[in-house]
Amino acid sequence: LQGLNKKETAEKYGDSQVHLWRRSYDVRPPALPKDDERNPAKQAPYQRYKGTVELPLTECLKDAVARVAPYFESEIKPKIELGENVLITAHGNSIRALRKYLEDISDDEIAGMNIPTGVPLVYHLNEDFTVDHVGYLGDEDIIRAKIDAVKMQSVRTEEKK
């Protein structure tokens, strides 16, 4: 689904299928052809991995969790253990993966979670790294509107009315 217009994709495949691809935990969308310009192996930022890592041509949230969780454990958690504050900026799907991992959110619950774009999410963790408190920063009405906007991204125009 990378690089595709969400509304046009919903018109082509149907809202239910696009929602399944975008929000389910373990259903991958169709893979990109290897010669597709959107293939990460053809993108400049990923050239440093050429020959060392096979970059995926499709990914579901389960795959993202499998990448995010070890990164959190090896790179982020040690900094927090040293008392550092850590700022993470990421795509919504990576944030969903991190939330699932940190908050132990069920597969079904994560399917309905919409991450608002550009809204800071703050975690307060206990010493054992369980979540003490998590919440978005900002005006609740604006945050709700941003969550709703993300939810509506793959809904066809005529169904919004």
Predicted features by range, described:
Residues 4-8, 17-63:
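Short glycine/proline- and acidic residue-enriched helix-loop micro-motifs
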Residues 23-24, 83-85, 89-93:
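Short, well-ordered beta-to-alpha junction loops that form the rim of enzyme active sites
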Residues 29-31, 95-98:
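Short catalytic/ligand-binding loop motif for oxyanion handling, primarily in non-cytosolic enzymes
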Residues 46-47, 88, 160-161:
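Short alpha-helical linear motifs
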Residues 1-13, 36, 57-66, 70, ...:
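Acidic, low-complexity terminal tails and accessory targeting/binding regions
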